[in-house]
Amino acid sequence: VENRAGYIQDQLQQAQELTDLSTYINETTQQMLDDETLSLKTLDSSSSDSLPLLLAAAPRMLETLRSKRISGIFLILNTHDFTGRTSGDRLPCVYLRDLDPDAAPSVVNSDILLECAPSELVQTFDIATDKAWSPALQYLDGEQDVFYVRPFQTAYEDNERMGAANYGRWTTLPYKLLGDDHEAIAYAQPLILDDGTVYGVLGVELLESYIDTKLPWDELQNDHHGSYLLASTTSDLKGEVLALHVTSNTGEQSVPLQNAKWELTLQRSNNCWYYMMDGKQQIASIRQIGLYSRNAPFSGERWLLVGVVGKNDLFSFSQ
C-alpha cells in the first residue's frame, strides 16, 4: 500500500500542477482586456464575447492534456458570485477529454473529444465532439457543479486572495457531465488576475475508469483477494475512528461499498484499522496522500489510499 500510495500521490500532484498553463491564460486575458478584445462585464455572458480567449487557450490546453497522464482538461469562465446564479445559466467553457491517456497519441487528435466548446471553436479546432457535446457548460446548482464551483467561490469570497493554486481542490464526489455517462473526479483552481479579479476556473479530470487501472487490487494478497480505496476524510488521523468518503475503488469491496453509499467508518484496535462489511471483518492499511499545502482552504480534506483484505483471507495461510 505504501508504494502504491506514493505512485498515486505522484500522479495526482503532477496532474494538479497547472502553473504554466494558468500563467499563460492570465497573461493572455490581461492582454485582451488591455486592448479591449475582452470585457470583464461580458466575459461570461456569451460564448461570442469570450471566444477570443477560448480560441487562444484551447491549443495550450491540448498540449497540457497530452503532456500529463490525465483524461480531461477544462476552462470555465465566470465573473459572478455563484450564489446569485440560477440553474440553467450557461457558462463559456472548453472541455477536452482523452478516453485512454496511456495510449500513444494520435497525430491528428482523433483520440480527443470536445465535451464542451462554442461551435466556432469546434469548426476551427478540428477535434470531434462527443455525443453529449454542448456549446457552453450549463450550471445546474447541484452536486454535479461542485467540482468547479467550490474552488471559484472560495477564492471569490476570500478578501485576502492567496495564490490561485492554494484554492485548488480535488472533488471528493465523482460527477458526470450533463448527458454523459462517464464518472470522473477533477482538480480545479480559480483563475485570478493580478488585481485580484476571479474570472474563471481551470482544471483537470481523471475518469473513474482510468483511476481504476492505477489501483491493481490483486497485488495486495497472493490469492487475489482485496480492494483498493481512494478516499478522503475530515477525521483526525490520530483518532480511533475514521469516517471515510470513498471516491474510487477496485476489487471485492466494490458492490458492498456501493450499497453503503460510499461511506465507511474504520475503527482502530491494537494499532490496526478494521471495519465490518456484510458480517465479515476487513483489515485496512492506510497511507495519507499529500495534495494540499498546510494552510490551504481545503487542507482539512485529507486524502488516503486504503488497502483492504478480509481478515479470513489475510490469515488463511496460518490456518
Where is each model-derived feature located?
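Juxtamembrane extracytoplasmic/periplasmic/luminal helical "stalk" adjacent to the first N-terminal
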Residues: V1-A57, R69-S71
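Short regulatory alpha-helical segment in sensory/regulatory domains of signaling proteins that mediates
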Residues: Q9, E27, P59-K68, L178-G179, ...
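Solvent-exposed, extracytoplasmic
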Residues: A56-M61, T197, V201-S248
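Short, hydrophobic-rich beta-strand element in sensory/regulatory alpha-beta domains
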Residues: L62, R69-F82, H225-A231
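Tryptophan-centric aromatic hotspots in well-structured domains and transmembrane helices
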Residues: G72-R85, V94-R97, T154-Y175, E301-W303, ...
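Extracytoplasmic/periplasmic ligand-binding sensor regions of membrane-associated signaling proteins
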Residues: C116-G203
